[in-house]
A protein has these predicted regions:
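Short N-terminal binding/cap micro-motifs at the start of the first secondary-structure element
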Residues: 11-18
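Divalent-metal-activated hydrolytic enzyme cores
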Residues: 43, 52-55, 59-81, 111-136
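Extreme N-terminal starter segment of soluble prokaryotic enzymes
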Residues: 1-4
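Short, surface-exposed acidic-centric catalytic microdomains
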Residues: 21-62
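N-terminal glycine-rich phosphate/adenylate-binding segment common to multiple enzyme folds
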Residues: 78-107
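General beta-strand structural signal in soluble alpha/beta enzymes
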Residues: 37-40, 89, 131-133
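Short, well-ordered beta-to-alpha junction loops that form the rim of enzyme active sites
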Residues: 8, 92-95, 135
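Short amphipathic alpha-helices and their capping/turn segments at secondary-structure boundaries
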Residues: 22-36, 74-89
Length: 136
């Protein structure tokens, strides 16, 4: 299988705080599969580290109040260039790019709501199966 994954889950230090979300469980699952790693946020030109961002209505805003929607959309569009032939995507939980079925509520309080990140919305529109890492 050809599987697209959030780069942070593979140990790439592209998370907003400069770290990663390496998953040994994912690493084991991916053995024998073709893997494509993406970080839509970095692909959209956002630095690492960066202020955390959350979806607020139809915009993405960082904790400093700056609208970063354009960067998130640009990065998601660039990441979409890598989907040809993929069988599924396994992505980071609650991310404003990669969150699947659950994201933070936009108040930077840690509260979660039902919803998808920007990149996940695009993947689902193309009929691609998206799995949250916590559901693997």
């Amino acid at each position: 299988m050809k599987i697209l994954v959030s780069a942070c889950l593979m140990g790439e230090n592209c998370k907003y705080n400069g770290g990663n979300n390496y998953s040994e469980k994912l690493h084991e699952f991916l053995k024998g599969h073709d893997v494509i790693m993406v970080c839509p946020e970095v692909m959209g030109g956002l630095p690492t580290p960066r202020l955390p961002s959350e979806i607020v209505g139809d915009r993405v805003v960082n904790s400093g109040g700056i609208d970063v929607t354009n960067e998130f959309v640009l990065g998601a569009n660039k990441a979409m260039e890598y989907i040809t032939g993929i069988d599924m995507a396994i992505l980071q939980s609650r991310s404003p790019s990669c969150g699947t079925n659950e994201i933070y509520d936009g108040t930077f309080s840690g509260n979660k709501i039902k919803g998808d990140g920007i990149f996940v919305r695009m993947l689902k529109e193309k009929g691609i199966k998206v799995v949250d890492i916590k559901d693997l």
